[in-house]
């Protein structure tokens, strides 16, 4: 039905084909009940681009129908650098290297030719995972000053997975920090925040009382992960490993000196 009227089969099939093309979602019909269903629901997994696109377009549709209250919908600023996203996506599709002008915080700008392997959205910023010819490097799109396609081809190894590359890390900061089994204690309302928005795919709830909840993680505790823990203030306490607990104490002590 559409606005109370029957939807022509040809229109339905066009919509179904468009959904398949845009989201990779297959809509099949059960010959016994004549009911339609999604035959590959796994594509809507939590980390899939299909789920992200679906959620984004759903929100877009809701807001488009709510122009009358646009002044009552408060959004975050769109991060800089998104104007380069289209060129990067085209380069990934075509397996073409890109030439970019990049400027790190507090440094001079420079030009670099890299092979674009993947893009990642993290905390409202887009990042490019690339290979320089010698090593992997991650670049923030909001620190790119210029970007263009080159005529130079590249080939990403068939066994390389961007998801696997980032799997052991909290965000986009990747280094040789050793893997660790981390146990934290969440106080007050913090456990509810962690349950509804886990910090990492390895997060597990291992103990719960009336006063606190313990969570475990298996990842590389890079600086951005520690910063995330600190952002919860006294709501999070690191229990294990002991060296990480000591490091957190030192970071808190240094921060305390500023006050």
Which positions does each model-derived feature cover?
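Polybasic (Lys/Arg-rich)
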Residues: 167-259
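A structural signal for short hydrophobic beta-strand segments in well-ordered beta-sheet cores
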Residues: 27, 119, 147, 205-206
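N-terminal helix-turn-helix
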Residues: 1-27
């Amino acid at each position: 039905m559409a606005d109370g009227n029957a939807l022509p089969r040809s229109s339905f099939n066009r919509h179904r084909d468009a959904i398949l093309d845009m989201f990779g979602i297959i809509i099949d019909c059960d010959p016994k009940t004549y009911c339609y269903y999604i035959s590959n629901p796994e594509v809507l997994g939590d980390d899939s681009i299909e789920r992200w696109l679906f959620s984004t377009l759903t929100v877009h549709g809701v807001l488009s129908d709510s122009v009358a209250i646009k002044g009552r919908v408060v959004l975050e600023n769109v991060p800089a650098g998104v104007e380069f996203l289209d060129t990067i996506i085209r380069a990934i599709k075509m397996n073409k290297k890109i030439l970019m002008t990049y400027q790190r915080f507090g440094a001079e700008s420079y030009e670099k030719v890299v092979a674009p392997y993947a893009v990642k959205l993290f905390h409202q910023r887009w990042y490019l995972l690339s290979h320089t010819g010698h090593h992997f490097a991650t670049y923030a799109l909001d620190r790119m000053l210029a970007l263009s396609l080159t005529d130079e081809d590249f080939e990403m190894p068939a066994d390389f997975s961007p998801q696997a590359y980032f799997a052991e890390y909290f965000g986009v900061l990747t280094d040789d920090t050793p893997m660790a089994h981390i146990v934290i204690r969440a106080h007050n309302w913090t456990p509810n925040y962690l349950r509804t928005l886990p910090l990492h795919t390895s997060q597990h709830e291992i103990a719960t009382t009336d006063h606190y909840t313990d969570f475990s993680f298996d990842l590389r505790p890079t600086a951005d992960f520690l910063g995330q823990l600190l952002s919860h203030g006294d709501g999070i306490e690191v229990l294990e490993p002991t060296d990480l607990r000591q490091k957190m104490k030192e970071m808190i002590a240094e921060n305390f000196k500023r006050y």
